[in-house]
Amino acid sequence: MEASASNPPSTSPETSASTPETPPGPEQLDEEQVKKAVEALLAHSRSRKNANGLLLNENENFFLMVVLWKIPSKELRVRLSLPHGIRSDLADVCLFTKDEPNLSSEQTERYYKKLLNNHGIKTISQIIPFRTLKKEYKAYEAKLRLLGSFDFFITDARIRRLLPSHLGRHFYNRKKVPVSVNLQSKTLSREINDCIGGTVLNISKSGSCSTIRIGHTGMPIQHIVENVVAVAKSLSQKLPEKWESVKLLFVKTERSVSLPVFSSFVSSQGEAKGLRTRDLLKKVSKKSRKKTERALKRQQEKKEKKLLKQAAKAKPAPTTDAVAPKTGGVPTQDPAPQEETGGVSALPKAQDDSEDEIPLLVPLKETPAAGSTKIQKAAIGKKSPKKSPGPNTARAKKRKASPALETPIAAEPKTPGKGPGKKARVKEEVEKERNSSLGKKDPRQTPKKPEAKFFTTASSSVKKAPRTLTQRPKKPKVPQST
C-alpha cells in the first residue's frame, strides 16, 4: 500500500513536464482503442440481426460523436474528406442544377448528363433543374417524396442560396441539406467524388455535441478506423480553436450505446491549450496580488476620508477656546452687529425726545412698505363715506385729517436729539433702506392698486363741488270755493 501511495506523486512531475513538449493534437488519439470500440459495435449489430432475423444486406451507419468545450456562437457546416467512401454504389444521389439560358428544363437536364459523362461520373442517379423543382415539387407531399427517395443531395454552387425557400424545413431537420459543388471546375470528377465519399459536420448553436457519419457496418474494420483518424486530423485544422476545442470523442451506431475513444482529461479549456501548470499558478498569483493591492488601497482611502471628516468636525471647537483666553473671559461681539444695534437704539432716543405724542418713526429693519400699509389702512377707512348715511360735508372733514397723519413722517428729522451728527446718521440710514427696498418687494406688502384708486377718487372728489340741497318753495294751497 505504501508503494502504491508513493507512485502517483513520482509520476506527476513527469506528466507536468511532458505536457508542454507534446502539444495537444490528433496524435493523442489511440488507434487501438478505436479498433476495439469498432469491433465491439460490429459484434453488437450482428447479434441484433440474428436475434431479430433481419436481412443480411441491411447495414447500419457508423457515427463519430464530437463533444466540444464551448457551444459555438454561430452554426458551422464543415465538409470533411474521407479516404474510404461511406456510401455504396447503390446509394441514390440527386443533383440540382441551374437553368441554362434559352433552354428548357429537359434540354438543361440532357446538357448536364453529357457534362457528367464526359468527366466519367456515374454515381449521380437523377438531375433536377431549378425550374422543375419550383413547378413539380411545390406541394408539401411532393417535397416529402423527394426527401425520402434519395440518400444524398448535391447542388450547383450558383443556386445554393435559393434552395432553402423551395425545399422546406424537413431537409434541414433530417440533416439532408444539399452540398454545394462547382460544376464549372476542370476537376469536376474529383470534387463530386470527394463530396459523395466524404462527410459533413453540422455544429449547431443549441449544444456542444454533434455527430459525423464515418462509415457503415458493411465496411471492413480497418477502413472505419482510418476514417476516424482522418476526421480527427481534419477537425484539428477546420475547427475555430483547432484541436483544443475538442473535449470528448465517441463511436456509435444508429441503435447502440456510444463508446468513448478520446478524452482530453483536463478541467478547463486553458489547460487544453498546452499551458504549463506553473504558468497558470503564476497567473493566479498575479491576479490575487492585484486584488489584495486594490483592497489595501481602498482601505487606506477610507481611513483617510474618516480622518479628514474627524478633523473637519474638531476644527470649530479649538477656535472658540483659543479666542476665550485672549478676551480675558469677557464676551465680545463683532463690529457689524454693534453698528446695527447702535442705529436701532438711536431711533427710540429720538422718539423719546420728540414733542409729538404719535410715534410714527419706523425702525431700520422695517421697510417703507410697512408704512405704506398703514397709510393704505387709513385710506381704506376713508373710503367708507359711501356707507355712512351722513351728508357730504363729513367727507371733507375726513379728507382734511389725512395730511395730519402723513405730516409726522415729514417732521421726523425736526425732533430734537442729543447731537446733530446722530440726526444725519439716522437720515442716511433711513434713505439707504428706502432706496434698497424700492427694488425688492415685501411679501407682506399689500398691492398698490387700491392706493391708486383712493387717490384717483380723492382727486375726482376734490374737483367736484359739493352739492347743497335746494328746496323749491311750495305753492300755497288755495281753498276750493264751494
Swiss-Prot record:
Query: According to its record, what are the GO cellular component terms?
Result: chromosome; cilium; cytosol; nucleolus
Q: Recite the UniProt keywords alphabetically.
A: Acetylation, Coiled coil, Isopeptide bond, Nucleus, Phosphoprotein, Ubl conjugation
Which residues are recorded as modified (Phosphoserine)?
S354, S384, S388, S461
> Any idea which residues bear N-acetylmethionine here?
M1
Biased composition (Low complexity) is annotated at 1-20, 309-327
Cross-link Glycyl lysine isopeptide (Lys-Gly) (interchain with G-Cter in SUMO2): located at?
K252, K427, K453
UniProt keyword Protein biosynthesis, yes or no: no
Where in the cell does this protein reside?
Nucleus, Nucleolus
Intrachain disulfide bonds: none
Coiled-coil region list: 284-315
Q: For the region Disordered, give the residue spans.
A: 1-32, 284-482
InterPro entries according to UniProt: eL8/uL1-like, Ribosomal_uL1-like, Ribosomal_uL1/biogenesis, Ribosomal_uL1_3-a/b-sand
Q: Principal place where this protein is found?
A: nucleus
- State where composition is biased (Basic and acidic residues): 293-304, 426-452
Assembly state and interactors?
A: Interacts with ING1. Interacts with KPNA7 and KPNA2.
* Function, in words: Regulates cellular senescence through inhibition of PTEN translation. Acts as a pro-apoptotic regulator in response to DNA damage.
Recorded family membership: Belongs to the universal ribosomal protein uL1 family. Highly divergent.
Q: Which PANTHER family match?
A: RIBOSOMAL PROTEIN L7AE FAMILY MEMBER (PTHR23105)
Protein name in UniProt: Ribosomal L1 domain-containing protein 1
What is the gene called?
RSL1D1
